[in-house]
Amino acid sequence: MQTRIDLVADLGEGYGDWRMGDDDALLGIVSSANVACGFHAGDPTIMDATAAACAERGIQLGAHPSFPDRVGFGRRDMGLSAAEVRNDLLYQLGALSAFAVAHGTRVRHVAPHGRLGNLVGVRADYAVAVADALCAFDDSLIVVAQDGELADEARRRGLPLAI
């Protein structure tokens, strides 16, 4: 049995000239990246540059969607309906996917960020909404989740899962 470790980091978390972390340093050591999709952090220019850098280095690109909460960095409960969660996820996946395709790669996984990432573990309606979005968008995407409702829903639907 061969063991493989996938080192992943959250990247593209900035706005305009402001950057959250040292993405260039992380790009030198990671094999996968969770890329902010514009709702908690990231903007079109940052998403484009991050997708390009990942494609150039052969780093697997993943979506890091969140609640539409820039001020709270995606860490606040927004009181969204399940339909809003589904639609927000589809919107963010589409945005990152466009940049990935522009650089000859594709989105490979999705890892919900912040409060969304916490709530999909305990709220079945949010877990179903995320799974619905993934099935509608690309059911080959690996779901990165904590053990809980989203992981259970991914298993029920036969979606690829990493915990």
What positions do the PLM features span?
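Active-site rim beta-loop-alpha module in soluble metabolic enzymes
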Residues: 148-163
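Hydrophobic faces of well-ordered beta-strands that scaffold small-molecule active sites
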Residues: 5-9, 33-35, 61-65, 108-112, ...
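N-terminal basic/disordered segments at the start of proteins
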Residues: 5-19
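A short alpha/beta connector and helix-capping loop motif
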Residues: 15-48
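Catalytic beta/alpha-barrel core
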Residues: 35-40, 119-120, 137-148
